């Protein structure tokens, strides 16, 4: 009797495994979207003022870290011009205007703005 029960249990387990392998993966899991990749595609080559970390401003001489920090902490923005409403020095406004065409604004994403990830994104050299 124990042997029969053991065989039946094994048969049920094997049938379950075969059924799980036979079902398509689309049935097993919903379409998973990566918010960060979607935002990268949306912004293109520009720096998104609502979702980028201060490190993205390193490519613009004079902006990192002081002006970049002010911009990151001053958001969210409706348009790129909203940055000029911040308390910036004349030099900082001049720098921002110099690189203005390199920036864009998309809707803020919780996944990219949670905690202090925009100030310290954990990337160290």
From Swiss-Prot:
Residues 1-29 form the signal peptide. It comes from the Bacteria. GO terms for cellular component: extrinsic component of membrane; photosystem II oxygen evolving complex; plasma membrane-derived thylakoid membrane. It is a peripheral membrane protein. InterPro entries: PSII_PsbU. Keywords: Electron transport, Membrane, Photosynthesis, Photosystem II, Signal, Thylakoid, Transport. GO terms for biological process: photosynthesis; photosystem II stabilization. The keyword Signal applies. SUPFAM superfamilies: PsbU/PolX domain-like. It is found in: Cellular thylakoid membrane. Belongs to the PsbU family. PSII is composed of 1 copy each of membrane proteins PsbA, PsbB, PsbC, PsbD, PsbE, PsbF, PsbH, PsbI, PsbJ, PsbK, PsbL, PsbM, PsbT, PsbX, PsbY, PsbZ, Psb30/Ycf12, peripheral proteins PsbO, CyanoQ (PsbQ), PsbU, PsbV and a large number of cofactors. It forms dimeric complexes. One of the extrinsic, lumenal subunits of photosystem II (PSII). PSII is a light-driven water plastoquinone oxidoreductase, using light energy to abstract electrons from H(2)O, generating a proton gradient subsequently used for ATP formation. The extrinsic proteins stabilize the structure of photosystem II oxygen-evolving complex (OEC), the ion environment of oxygen evolution and protect the OEC against heat-induced inactivation. This is Photosystem II extrinsic protein U.
